[in-house]
From Swiss-Prot:
Keywords for this protein: Lipid transport, Secreted, Signal, Transport, VLDL
Function summary: Inhibitor of lipoprotein binding to the low density lipoprotein (LDL) receptor, LDL receptor-related protein, and very low density lipoprotein (VLDL) receptor. Associates with high density lipoproteins (HDL) and the triacylglycerol-rich lipoproteins in the plasma and makes up about 10% of the protein of the VLDL and 2% of that of HDL. Appears to interfere directly with fatty acid uptake and is also the major plasma inhibitor of cholesteryl ester transfer protein (CETP). Binds free fatty acids and reduces their intracellular esterification.
UniProt-listed InterPro entries: ApoC-1_sf (IPR043081), ApoC-I (IPR006781)
This protein's name: Apolipoprotein C-I
GO terms under cellular component: high-density lipoprotein particle; very-low-density lipoprotein particle
Biological processes annotated in GO: lipid transport; lipoprotein metabolic process; negative regulation of cholesterol transport; negative regulation of lipid catabolic process; negative regulation of very-low-density lipoprotein particle clearance; triglyceride metabolic process; very-low-density lipoprotein particle clearance
Signal peptide: 1-26
Subcellular location: Secreted
Organism encoding this protein: Ailurus fulgens (Himalayan red panda)
Family affiliation: Belongs to the apolipoprotein C1 family.
Amino acid sequence: MRLFLSLPVLVVVLAMVLEGPAPAQAAPEISRTFERIPDKLKEFGNTLEDKAREVLETIKQSDIPAKTRNWFSETYNKVKEQLKTAFS
């Protein structure tokens, strides 16, 4: 039953895709596209910057860096003590 329903839907979707864009959806002039590239790149850069700042602030506010630093310090001190006792 599912196959009978999915095949016509698949055929309709495939026909729409192969038909191509409608005339109203045709690509604008290439010069307009090139004119908008710097604006799009600036917008992309701004959103990327904002997201990176949010991530960094989240990391700074969390206690993960402090816990990681403490764990490395403790592990380093343990290894150092073990080496001292082993080679003494």
